[in-house]
């Protein structure tokens, strides 16, 4: 396991590019694998999770060429096949959930999907129950609603599927990507309020690019039947979740940084980081395709509803530590179901640095202390915690040692190099 050694940094300066969007890359490569013909995914995220989707799609029959030099993936899709081995999707929950549904459309036999320790704890039962309503046989090998998942080849029957909206939006994305294969139109009815709605907006956006028509209804969505995915050339935009660490660093530290490849009209929910730091008092400049930050700024605590932005929780928690007054994060029960229990992890680890932070069932209360001290932190193999805690370490007195640096390969493989290029005092050991 690698350690990240982070020391207090007085100045950040430079122009950097936000890494490509993880959410868009996943959906683009899976959609392209379902399209009959050749698609090009341009500027994809070369992160471990998205490469898990590449691996899973290859196992299900797609021919995918990865061209590092041109920074594009060429995908020849359209013909699903029965995999000749178990599909190991590593640490990618998105891959597991979307491909569980897609695997039902193989021509014969079974597909088995599994992953690492963290993945084998993630809830899958709501999706398995939904698939059962559509005559699809998919079950947990342990019969406890978690991976390994065994999926039987089968035709979709039925025109209504009911599913909860408050556990994971990935279940709904999975159904949306499957149901164009149904011969008839299908209504997805949400039986509880939808959380992480912006991720569904991303799914709708990319499915529309592939020629798939889905309408919103009063209580869910209507997916039209007998549709075909069309091959496309698709350029992946920058990722606001990953950029949130760069934005937080610029806001907290004396800085002059420009983050390119961030589009003001993006459908990503995590674009909310812009309004969050502005509301806290950071006068950052937002252009059509970039963000300019001239920090540092005096921040004040605010209340943040994280129902739709679970991935921003670690970033907001760190910002709250350095803000005047109280920052409250609420509506985040689902944040406990990520790579780790992120609410607990933020509370436990930031306390080691001297933070005044209190855990609640659905969030965190942080009282700004303005100063943190270096400490040795555990990140529970969670990429977002590695990056958020790095930003805390850049502002803290002394040296912060962060375990599990390699986790950043999931969403922001060159995070350390990008931070160093801005002048961050960090090294990997």
From Swiss-Prot:
- Please name the PROSITE patterns in this protein's record: EPSP_SYNTHASE_1, EPSP_SYNTHASE_2
Task: Specify which residues bind phosphoenolpyruvate according to the UniProt entry for this protein.
Answer: 22, 93, 122, 170, 342, 384
The protein's enzyme class = transferase
Q: Which residues bind 3-phosphoshikimate?
A: 22-23, 27, 168-170, 196, 311, 338
Reactions catalysed: 3-phosphoshikimate + phosphoenolpyruvate = 5-O-(1-carboxyvinyl)-3-phosphoshikimate + phosphate
Please name the catalytic residues of this protein.
311
Q: One GO CC annotation, please? A: cytoplasm
Q: What is its main location?
A: cytoplasm
EC no. given is 2.5.1.19
Where can this protein be found? Cytoplasm
Q: Which GO terms label this protein's molecular function in UniProt?
A: 3-phosphoshikimate 1-carboxyvinyltransferase activity
Please describe what this protein does.
Catalyzes the transfer of the enolpyruvyl moiety of phosphoenolpyruvate (PEP) to the 5-hydroxyl of shikimate-3-phosphate (S3P) to produce enolpyruvyl shikimate-3-phosphate and inorganic phosphate.
Q: What is this protein called?
A: 3-phosphoshikimate 1-carboxyvinyltransferase
Natural source organism = Methanocaldococcus jannaschii (strain ATCC 43067 / DSM 2661 / JAL-1 / JCM 10045 / NBRC 100440) (Methanococcus jannaschii)
Query: What would be the name of the gene that encodes this protein?
Result: aroA
């Amino acid at each position: 396991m690698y350690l990240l050694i982070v020391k207090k940094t007085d100045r950040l300066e430079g122009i950097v590019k936000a890494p490509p969007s993880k959410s868009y890359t996943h959906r683009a490569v899976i959609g392209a694998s379902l399209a009959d013909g050749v698609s090009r995914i341009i500027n994809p995220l070369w992160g471990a999770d998205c490469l898990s989707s590449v691996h899973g799609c290859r196992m299900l029959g797609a021919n995918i060429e990865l061209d590092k030099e041109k920074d594009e993936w060429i995908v020849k899709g359209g013909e699903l096949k029965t995999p000749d081995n178990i599909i190991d999707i590593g640490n990618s929950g998105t891959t597991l959930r979307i491909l569980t549904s897609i695997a039902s459309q193989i021509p014969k036999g079974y597909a088995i999907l599994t992953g690492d320790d963290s993945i084998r704890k993630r809830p899958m039962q709501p999706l398995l129950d939904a698939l059962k309503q559509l005559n699809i046989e998919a079950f947990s090998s342990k019969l406890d609603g978690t991976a390994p998942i065994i999926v039987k080849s089968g035709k979709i029957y039925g025109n209504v599927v009911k599913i909860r909206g408050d556990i994971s939006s990935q279940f709904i994305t999975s159904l949306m990507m499957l149901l164009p294969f149904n011969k008839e139109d299908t209504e997805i009815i949400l039986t509880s309020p939808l959380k992480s709605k912006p991720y569904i907006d991303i799914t709708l956006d990319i499915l529309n690019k592939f020629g798939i028509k889905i309408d919103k209804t009063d209580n869910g969505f209507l997916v039209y039947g007998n549709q075909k995915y069309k091959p496309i050339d698709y350029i992946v935009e920058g990722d606001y979740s990953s950029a949130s660490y760069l934005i937080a660093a610029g806001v907290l530290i004396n800085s002059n940084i420009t983050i390119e490849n961030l589009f003001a009209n993006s459908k990503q929910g995590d674009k909310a980081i812009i309004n969050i730091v502005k509301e806290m008092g950071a006068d950052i400049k937002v252009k059509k395709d970039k963000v300019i930050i001239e920090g540092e700024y005096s921040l004040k605590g605010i209340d943040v509803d994280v129902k739709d932005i679970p991935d921003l929780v670690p970033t907001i928690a760190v910002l709250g530590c350095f803000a005047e007054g109280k920052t409250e994060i609420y509506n985040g029960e689902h944040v406990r179901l990520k790579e780790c229990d992120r609410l607990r992890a933020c509370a436990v680890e930031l306390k080691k640095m001297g933070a005044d932070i209190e855990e609640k069932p659905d969030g965190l209360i942080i009282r700004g202390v303005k100063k943190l001290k270096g400490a040795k932190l555990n990140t529970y193999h969670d990429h977002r915690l590695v990056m958020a805690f790095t930003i805390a370490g850049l502002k803290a007195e002394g040296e912060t040692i962060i375990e599990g640096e390699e986790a950043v390969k999931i969403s922001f493989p060159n995070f350390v190099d990008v931070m160093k290029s801005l002048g961050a005092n960090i090294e990997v050991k």
